């Protein structure tokens, strides 16, 4: 005789003993589950399905409660594939939201949305865990002082400075140096600020995630020999994952970053690649839960979901989380609800230009398209602001003159315009910089340039004091003194060739 799988002995239900429910309905990644009266789980509680499928293979699926339907039924979204699940299977209510490991033991490791390591390096050596659903810091805890987050990268610090505890949008196509810029920022925050980084791969390609991991190992950001000395923790929810995982993986990464800020009192850099995929996953889940779609088919709760994530990324009196978010703009339409909602939260934008990358100028940050709310005299000071504005004016004038140069040549320009072009070309090259993480590829030692040194360098170029130096002297150097030294070396080399 076949026994009911939900009872352990006649007349006594294990559902009532263990506070477990039964699967009623499965539609893709969405499960409807019935619980005993009075034993309903709370919204966002984690539910676990542990069983065996028809091939006697172990099933272990974690779900998150999204809706209470009435009649003791809840609707949950699975965080992994629902293959092999059947009606009638037992579902255990954990009584708490999804919790993930936090702390120093997470550095150098790769996790999935559930906080399980997926790098084949064994379990994580930590007992500390945090729930992924947490409140944003209270107003009284926030640090209201506006301060610049120095990155040591000249073009960023001068023209589009980052705010400590701010949010930065990183716009760039494939092959313009986005990954290298991300790795350099991770490296510099570790060295200059004693901080750590968390990278959240939200709905990205598995190949790109793997490439990033390999490049981090190669450049030393992840230390294979001594994993505790690594500077970054990685959390991945790839494109092939169910929408529930892609929707929550950003929160998993953010939770790990919050521990470093609140408990270790550190400055943390949080990378989210790509924030659009977070919105996209939320849209899929919303449709699966039967909600009426809003504009352009997005979820009606788009602003709420984005706000609940972004409001947790902030500076407190203990430390800061500075977030750099790659933003995909669908069909290059900036009015699309997903990027438009993201822009409302950003303090700065860093735009990577294919034109600059093709000239070999790295980092290929576009000095005219990149913006920052921090570039104001009352925040950065008059000297910084005026230098940045003069640099932008010179580059803008050069851009306007390029058509004339292409048709008539440099000789047809006025003396003043020729001087502007010469200085703009020097500025363009001086905005390039050798990176620490690219040392293994270029052979040039990396350079960290402080903000004061950066301002001094550009002031000297704008004042005309360095008009006699060749353009090549400004290419891939750190501070302005290195450009002068390089000019002397170039002169000596040319004499030797003669």
Swiss-Prot record:
Keywords: ATP synthesis, ATP-binding, CF(1), Chloroplast, Hydrogen ion transport, Ion transport, Membrane, Nucleotide-binding, Plastid, Thylakoid, Translocase, Transport. It holds the Pfam family ATP-synt_ab_N. Disulfide bonds: none annotated. GO terms for biological process: proton motive force-driven mitochondrial ATP synthesis. PROSITE patterns: ATPASE_ALPHA_BETA (PS00152). It comes from the Eukaryota. InterPro entries: AAA+_ATPase, ATP-synt_VA_C, ATP_synth_F1_bsu, ATPase_a/bsu_AS, ATPase_alpha/beta_chains, ATPase_F1/V1/A1_a/bsu_N, ATPase_F1/V1/A1_a/bsu_N_sf, ATPase_F1/V1/A1_a/bsu_nucl-bd. GO terms for molecular function: ATP binding; ATP hydrolysis activity; proton-transporting ATP synthase activity, rotational mechanism. ATP binds at residues 172-179. It is found in: Plastid, Chloroplast thylakoid membrane. Its EC number is 7.1.2.2. It catalyses: ATP + H2O + 4 H(+)(in) = ADP + phosphate + 5 H(+)(out). Its main location: plastid. It is an enzyme of class 7 (translocase). The keyword Translocase applies. GO terms for cellular component: chloroplast thylakoid membrane; mitochondrion; proton-transporting ATP synthase complex. Produces ATP from ADP in the presence of a proton gradient across the membrane. The catalytic sites are hosted primarily by the beta subunits. Belongs to the ATPase alpha/beta chains family. NCBIfam families: atpD. F-type ATPases have 2 components, CF(1) - the catalytic core - and CF(0) - the membrane proton channel. CF(1) has five subunits: alpha(3), beta(3), gamma(1), delta(1), epsilon(1). CF(0) has four main subunits: a(1), b(1), b'(1) and c(9-12). This is ATP synthase subunit beta, chloroplastic. It comes from Saccharum officinarum (Sugarcane). The gene is atpB.
């Amino acid at each position: 005789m076949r026994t009911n799988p939900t009872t352990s002995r006649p007349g006594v239900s294990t559902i009532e003993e263990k506070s477990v429910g039964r699967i009623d309905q499965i539609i893709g990644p969405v499960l409807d589950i019935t619980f005993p009266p009075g034993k309903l789980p709370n919204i966002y509680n984690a539910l676990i399905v542990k069983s065996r499928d028809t091939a006697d293979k172990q099933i272990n699926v974690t779900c998150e409660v999204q809706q209470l339907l009435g009649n003791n039924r809840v609707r949950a979204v699975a965080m992994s594939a629902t293959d092999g699940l059947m009606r009638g299977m037992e579902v255990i209510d954990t009584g708490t939201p999804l919790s993930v490991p936090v702390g120093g033991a997470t550095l150098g490791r790769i996790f999935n949305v559930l906080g399980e390591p997926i790098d084949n390096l064994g379990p994580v050596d930590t007992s500390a865990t945090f729930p992924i659903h947490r409140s944003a810091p209270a107003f009284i805890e926030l640090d209201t002082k506006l301060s610049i987050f120095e990155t040591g990268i000249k073009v960023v610090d001068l023209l589009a400075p980052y705010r400590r505890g701010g949010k930065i949008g990183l716009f760039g196509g494939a092959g313009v140096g986005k990954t290298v810029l991300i790795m350099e920022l991770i490296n510099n925050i570790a060295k200059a600020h004693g901080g750590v980084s968390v990278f959240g791969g939200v709905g990205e390609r598995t190949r790109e995630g793997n490439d990033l991991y390999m490049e981090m190992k190669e450049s030393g950001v992840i230390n294979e020999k001594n994993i505790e000395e690594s500077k970054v923790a990685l959390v991945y929810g790839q494109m092939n994952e169910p929408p529930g995982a892609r929707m929550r993986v950003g929160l998993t990464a953010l939770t790990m970053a919050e521990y470093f800020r609140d408990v270790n009192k550190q400055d943390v850099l949080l990378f989210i690649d790509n924030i659009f995929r977070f919105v996209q996953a939320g849209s899929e889940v919303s449709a699966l839960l039967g909600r009426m779609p809003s504009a352009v088919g997005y979820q009606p709760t788009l602003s709420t979901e984005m706000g609940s994530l972004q409001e947790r990324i902030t500076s407190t009196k203990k430390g800061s989380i500075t977030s750099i978010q790659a933003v995909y703009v669908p069909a290059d339409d900036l009015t699309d609800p997903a990027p438009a909602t993201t822009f409302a939260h950003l303090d700065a934008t860093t735009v990577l230009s294919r034109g600059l990358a093709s000239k070999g100028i790295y980092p290929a940050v576009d000095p005219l398209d990149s913006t920052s709310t921090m570039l104001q005299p009352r925040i950065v000071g008059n000297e910084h602001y005026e230098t940045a504005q003069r640099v932008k004016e010179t580059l803008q004038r050069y851009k306007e003159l390029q058509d004339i140069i292409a048709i008539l040549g440099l000789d047809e320009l006025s003396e003043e315009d020729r001087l502007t072009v010469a200085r703009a070309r020097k500025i363009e090259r001086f905005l390039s910089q050798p990176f620490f993480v690219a040392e293994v590829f270029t052979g040039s030692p990396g350079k960290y340039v402080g903000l004061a040194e950066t301002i001094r360098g550009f002031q000297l170029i704008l004042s005309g004091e360095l008009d006699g130096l060749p353009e090549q002297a400004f290419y891939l150097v750190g501070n302005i003194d290195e450009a002068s030294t390089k000019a002397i070396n170039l002169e000596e080399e040319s004499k030797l060739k003669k």
